């Protein structure tokens, strides 16, 4: 009997031990399952969007993260485009490198030459992804020798913005904005009075590039650096001279307001009635319409008389994949990029920011049509882009020293207000930028 009881006790103990062991194994398996469920591929995304733009971007990222369970995109603000590029230089190729990075359009040549990026063309080819759904006049900028290097994201172009109320007061038709230089000069004369000016351009190199390209003028040789390595500038021909002469003449006639280099100052001057017409980015149209205490009109970039309109170059930025990161992360980033370019996401992006939709199908969605009914000015910006002819001029120039070049142009523009002859100012900028190009070749 005692033996039987002892056996029973031992058996009970063993059962108890086995029961606890099974429970432990079960819990461990559950924990592993949970870990497998929550483990996602992380995509660190560096960007330069701030304020309302960052809010709109974060909404897109949050929606993507919630739409699937395998990828987690982490947006990280890195300051201005220039600041972000400086930080990229410090970490590219290291474990601290992001997977995805937003870089401004003039950084294209630099990024390609860095050797640290993976062209999105790789994933386009592997998947047979249809890029015809993307706006060709935007994609063209980031296409070099048939390879699409980055995915267009926030793109804009320049437009003429004008005060319709001021037009009426001056006896001008508010529905017929100036389309040529002679019309611009004539309208500016009628609009200039009582300390208020007819026209202004921000002292910013981008606007010079645009006024050059709309005429078909090239910024540098070798077909704007698209056929081969650019070795010297080409902007100091008749097209560039026309731009400088326009500014010089209007300033000396007293119809042009020197607004400086600050975007906020420029927009504030327009809203206060200091000038009746100026050039701005298409991305700023809605904000201007909302904040101006008068009716705002938007039109195409004016061109010289008797010159055929070629179109505009896109500005803004694109998304770049890093080369030296895990393939899994690159594929995850590509999934996010595809999501971003869907019509639904692009429609929301266009409505919330004013940037163009990379996927034009977005313009057919109700959310955009409703926005255009409220802001018909946005349609003008889209139409100007659609009507742009694909040429080396409108593709934009490819040079690695673009930031420096822009500053040289700014200095040249400012010298016009000091009485420097337009041709002399243009040649001085050309010589300085040619030296920069020569130095870049030696690095």
Question: What do the PLM-derived regions correspond to, one by one?
Answer:
Residues 1-44, 66, 424-427, 431-443:
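Short, low-complexity disordered leader/linker segments with a strong preference
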Residues 38-50, 71-76, 99-100, 149, ...:
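Short, well-ordered beta-strand elements
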Residues 50-72, 409:
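Short, polar/charged alpha-helical segment
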Residues 63-134, 169-171, 269, 276-277, ...:
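Extracytoplasmic "Venus flytrap"/periplasmic binding protein-like
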Residues 66-67, 72-74, 89, 170, ...:
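Extracytoplasmic/periplasmic substrate-recognition and gating elements
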Residues 104-162, 185, 201, 209-214, ...:
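Hinge/lid segment of periplasmic solute-binding proteins
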Residues 187-190, 229-259:
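Glycine-centered hinge/linker elements that transmit conformational signals in sensory
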Residues 377-432:
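C-terminal capping/gating helix-and-loop segments adjacent to ligand/active sites or protein-protein/ligand interfaces
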